[in-house]
Amino acid sequence: MTRDSSLSGVFSRNWIFIRGVPAIRFLPPEGPPEIAFAGRSNVGKSSLINALVQQKGLARTSNTPGRTQELNYFIPDGFSGQRGDLPPFAVVDMPGYGFAAAPKNLVDAWTNLIFSYLRGRSTLKRVYLLIDSRHGIKNNDEDVLALLDKAAVSYQIVLTKSDKIKSNALEKLIMITQTKLLKHPAAYPEILATSSEKAYGLEELRAAILQTIA
């Protein structure tokens, strides 16, 4: 299967979960390009991934902040995984951060796993950092921005739940966020506004992903 044909309708294919990675030694061998999604707990990360590939229940959603503490790998189904028949890319759902009253050892383990992955994964093409439109960039997000800058990984801000605020407030938030990103050398300048519930901004996000892995 050629790369161009594998990208045709990739977001409409059936997607499957292939692996949870609790520690860096469990990472799959480097293969296709990887796109990672990061964000605070309950930012709507799982819902956005599910909406992106039009498949409810692929990435598990939870009302319990910090439930998932692994790197979860998803790929489109129908590829053998052998040389010449790799999926066009993999989606990596990173653990949520910023949950209240987290034990220090859990935070340290999360930080070590994430930084090791970011710094050492040559197939990682971009991290999409999700920010809740109702709250903007918070202190925990700033810490992750610094981590991404330190790892020198390309990342892009995706605003979630943008249907929950008025259009003028969203425009103001985008301007404020763009100004903040001027201090972050690894940040991609364009900000994407999305809503999983209303399917808003999903086509723009899909296009951005395909452009990133092209």
Curated annotation (Swiss-Prot):
The keyword DNA-binding appears for this protein: no
A GO biological-process term: division septum assembly
Cofactors (names): Mg(2+)
A Pfam family it matches: MMR_HSR1
Binding-site residues for Mg(2+), renumbered to this chain: 46, 68
Annotated GO CC locations: cytosol
Identification of the protein by name: Probable GTP-binding protein EngB
Gene: engB
Keyword Thylakoid: no
A GO term for molecular function: metal ion binding
Residues reported in the UniProt entry to bind GTP: 39-46, 66-70, 93-96, 160-163, 194-196
Family: Belongs to the TRAFAC class TrmE-Era-EngA-EngB-Septin-like GTPase superfamily. EngB GTPase family.
HAMAP family on file: GTPase_EngB (MF_00321)
Residue intervals of the EngB-type G domain: 31-214
Gene3D superfamilies hit by this protein: P-loop containing nucleotide triphosphate hydrolases
Function of the protein: Necessary for normal cell division and for the maintenance of normal septation.
Keywords: Cell cycle, Cell division, GTP-binding, Magnesium, Metal-binding, Nucleotide-binding, Septation
